[in-house]
Amino acid sequence: LTAAQIIYPCMQATDIFFLKADICQLGMDQRKVNMLAREYCDAIKRRNKPIILSHPMLMGLKEGQAKMSKSDPDSAIFMEDSEADVNLKIKKAYCPPGVVEANPVLDYLKHIIFARMGEFTVERSERDGGLIKYASYPELEADYVNGTLHPGDLKPA
């Protein structure tokens, strides 16, 4: 191991204590750092361990991006983005027809929309098949794979 591989996780865990965080929310890729902080609490007999909330990492919006990046604003949706900015980023997002793997639009639907709302509605003209209401992500994914649902209908929804 390099010095950085040893020191950097310790620095990340130290942030949790320096900030006096009761709850620490990080992506699943940071789970080991969170567990290191909790194990350190055991070692020093600290009674109040930080509560760890881990969540899935969202893909970047461009093709081939495993996760969003703050250094590439077009690859991520930020809390301060306007509705127009979000709509433009989703419109430009990588979303190949019928492909589920590495598809950020479907990833967002699965981990944000369905996790929070439980359903999703696609409004389209009668000529294009009319309104579709999805009660579950697997139902939407099946329609996407078989071509019933096209990216051009999915993205503006």
Language-model segments: which ranges?
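N-terminal Rossmann-like or analogous alpha/beta NTP/dinucleotide-binding catalytic cores
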Residues: 1-11, 34
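Conserved nucleotide- and phosphate/pyrophosphate-binding catalytic cores
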Residues: 13, 31-157
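A long, hydrophobic alpha-helical segment
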Residues: 14-28, 38
